[in-house]
Structure formats: structure tokens, C-alpha cells
Curated annotation (Swiss-Prot):
Assembly notes: Heterododecamer (2C3:3R2) of six catalytic PyrB chains organized as two trimers (C3), and six regulatory PyrI chains organized as three dimers (R2).
Organism (species): Anaeromyxobacter dehalogenans (strain 2CP-C)
Family assignment from sequence similarity: Belongs to the aspartate/ornithine carbamoyltransferase superfamily. ATCase family.
Biochemical pathway: Pyrimidine metabolism; UMP biosynthesis via de novo pathway; (S)-dihydroorotate from bicarbonate: step 2/3
Gene: pyrB
UniProt KW keywords: Pyrimidine biosynthesis, Transferase
EC number: 2.1.3.2
HAMAP family for this protein: Asp_carb_tr
Name of this protein: Aspartate carbamoyltransferase catalytic subunit
Pfam families, per the entry: OTCace (PF00185), OTCace_N (PF02729)
Length: 313
């Protein structure tokens, strides 16, 4: 359990204390990653099934790595090699996999709400690895962990989220999590890529990039979600990059020296971020990847019923 939750589906559901429970445990899990032998017996005998209906590099590999470091058995499943191609429903697929008695189902799906639907029909814990444009809770948690690690705290800090906010499940999870930890959130991007009503979550909305990043402690750059966009919402990527992309000159002129830059990946280099910025000293993007393993270890440990404090060592 994570606090009162059997599942990890949306950070909208999580309290400040429940978010901190995960990222505090992730500190211990990250220590395991620094060891020469990266293996602990915490989840020995447990099974984690990864169901991915959408392409993924970081998230699927991260959950698989997290499970294996904790000594759980990990089964990776993709829709292209399953009976879904023969017309089997999502719920039937989940029920059949649950019959194999996994402890955790990790699911990524193009439809918002798919993980919650699965959770209503299975008895094991369900973790959302991203559902449509709804949420990506483990990414939101690893962003919280990374920011706290780099900034010391999120209390009183300002985070700018820039790009295609409307179609970003990462942005939604961050929006639900950051204010609970005391951070102020600024959203920036084309008006056509800004969802209505985000102000109710405590964010301020900007269309001017310089204004949005002025004085920010961290900037999270988002890619354009072409796969979720129907009619074009911007004139073109070149024009987008000129206005909302972050290059070395803008970073040097507009960001305060201590500001860090994050990106959930994959990066469209030369569009939202120039290579110089993505690979530069401000970038903590690869830290996010490593922290993602630690955070997902914490999630799996809490949901699968880890074997106690001694098993972490």
C-alpha cells in the first residue's frame, strides 16, 4: 500500500504525505543502485507484469529494471504479440494475466482511464505507466524526487512547465504533485496547447517563454505530442522552436544560474531543446532516468508488500 492506496493510478488521488512516502523510500532505493551488486531480496517470490499498449523505452525498461533489482520476476507483455490483435478486450486480457497470479500489473495505454478500469476488474495492485493524456504518476513522482534532490526542497520553489501541456500526461501528474509539496507552477506554450481550467490547480498560464522562466528554479520542457494531435495546432516545428524552444542563448540570457532543466523524454532535439542545452551543465535529464528506477523500485516495494526493513539491505 502507498498510504491508503492499493494502486498507483493518478497523483490527483495522492496526498502530500503519500507522495513523500514514495520519494523518501526512493532515497534508500537509489543507494542500492550505487552498489557494485545491484540486487536485494525485497520482492523475492513476487511477480510484476508489464502490459504496454504504447511504445516505451524509458518507462518499460525502468519498471523491468526496478523489479529485477528487487528480485521480483518480471514478465513483459506487448499488445502486438497478444490476443488483443484478435479482438480480445483490455479487461479480458487483464483478467487472463491476473489468473497467472501476479502481484502487480503495470499498464500503459493510449486511452485515458484504462488503468483505473483494469483496477476495477482485477485483485492485484495496478500501476499506471501512462494513460492517454490523463496522467503518468511514476514520472510525476520521479520529477518530485529529482527536484528535491537538486533543489533541496520544493517548498517555495518555482517550476516552469513549457510546451504541449494540453496533451501531456506528465504535465498533469506534475501539476497535481508539485503544489502539494509547496512549489509554484507556471505553464507556458501556445494557447492551442494549453488546457482550460488549469488555474484551478494553482498554476499560472503564460504564452511568453521569457516571462515564464524568469526567476524559475527549474524548467521542464515537453515535446509536441504529434501522435495525440489531430488537426495541426501550430504553424510548424520551426516556428514553434523559435518562440517556445530553449537554446543556449536563451538559457544563458533568461535563466538564473542555479536553474535546472528537466525533460521526460523522448527529446526532439532542435525543437523544444537544443543539443547544447539538453547535454549542458543545467540538464538533469539523465538524473531523471536513474531516479526513475529508484522511484519505481519504491512503488513496487510498497504495493507488492516488501519483506520488511531488513530486505532493503
Amino acid at each position: 500500500m502507498i498510504g491508503r492506496h492499493k494502486h498507483c493510478i493518478a497523483l490527483e488521488d495522492f496526498s502530500r504525505e503519500e507522495i513523500l512516502e514514495v520519494i523518501d523510500l526512493a532515497v534508500s532505493m537509489k543507494e542500492v543502485l550505487q552498489r557494485p551488486i545491484k540486487k536485494v531480496p525485497s520482492l523475492r517470490g513476487k511477480m510484476v507484469v508489464n502490459l504496454f499498449f504504447e511504445a516505451s523505452t524509458r518507462t518499460r525498461s525502468s519498471f523491468e529494471t526496478a523489479a529485477k533489482i528487487l528480485s521480483a520476476d518480471a514478465l513483459n507483455w506487448t499488445s502486438s504479440s497478444s490476443s488483443v490483435t484478435k479482438g480480445e478486450t483490455l479487461v479480458d486480457t487483464a483478467k487472463n494475466l491476473e489468473a497467472m497470479r501476479p502481484d502487480v500489473l503495470v499498464i500503459r495505454h493510449s486511452a485515458g482511464g484504462a488503468p483505473r478500469l483494469v483496477a476495477e476488474h482485477v485483485g492485484c495492485s495496478v500501476v499506471s505507466a501512462g494513460d492517454g493524456a490523463h496522467e503518468h504518476p511514476s514520472q510525476g513522482l520521479l520529477d518530485c524526487f529529482t527536484l528535491r534532490e537538486k533543489l533541496g526542497t520544493l517548498e517555495g520553489k518555482t517550476v516552469a512547465i513549457v510546451g504541449d501541456v494540453s496533451h501531456s500526461r506528465v504535465a498533469r501528474s506534475d501539476l497535481h504533485a508539485f503544489p502539494k509539496l509547496g512549489a509554484k507552477v507556471r505553464l507556458c506554450g501556445p494557447p492551442t496547447m494549453m488546457p482550460a481550467g488549469v488555474e484551478r490547480l494553482g498554476a499560472t498560464v503564460h504564452t511568453d517563454l521569457r516571462e515564464a522562466v524568469d526567476g524559475a528554479d527549474a524548467v521542464i520542457m515537453l515535446r509536441i505530442q504529434h501522435e495525440r494531435i489531430g488537426d495541426p495546432l501550430i504553424p510548424g516545428t520551426r516556428e514553434y522552436s523559435k518562440v517556445w524552444g530553449l537554446n543556449a542563448k536563451k538559457a544563458a540570457d533568461w535563466l538564473k544560474p542555479s536553474c535546472v532543466i528537466l525533460h521526460p523524454g523522448p527529446i526532439n532535439r532542435g525543437v523544444e531543446l537544443s543539443p547544447e542545452v539538453a547535454d549542458g551543465p543545467r540538464s538533469v535529464i539523465l538524473d531523471q532516468v536513474q531516479n526513475g528506477v529508484a522511484v519505481r523500485m519504491a512503488i513496487l516495494y510498497l504495493l507488492a508488500g516488501g519483506a520488511g526493513e531488513e530486505a532493503r539491505a
